[in-house]
């Protein structure tokens, strides 16, 4: 397998940042509503591994549900994948966040001769630029 891209968890807020979130210390503010994924689902386990035990106001069964809470204004901040922020213009990352793991690594492998060209394309600068445009960390 050839790793072609990574995805990592980031703190996101509704566009305009109404809660005036400026850094990781805001994850523990009592006056803000924090949405995360629940323990036992991949995004929840990854969130806990990256940020530790957070005082969440809501624990969702999917990252899409966390994203919905942000979009609807039901949460002031939430932890989602970087690609979710790139795909949803109604949320933003409120401060520069390093691409820290644990992260999801996407790898490709050719199972036949016909797949070799596709795997080579995924590793190309063209494909890497497309992946980066969609929020993935590239290799």
Residues covered by each model-derived region:
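Exported/periplasmic ABC-transporter solute-binding proteins
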Residues: 2-139
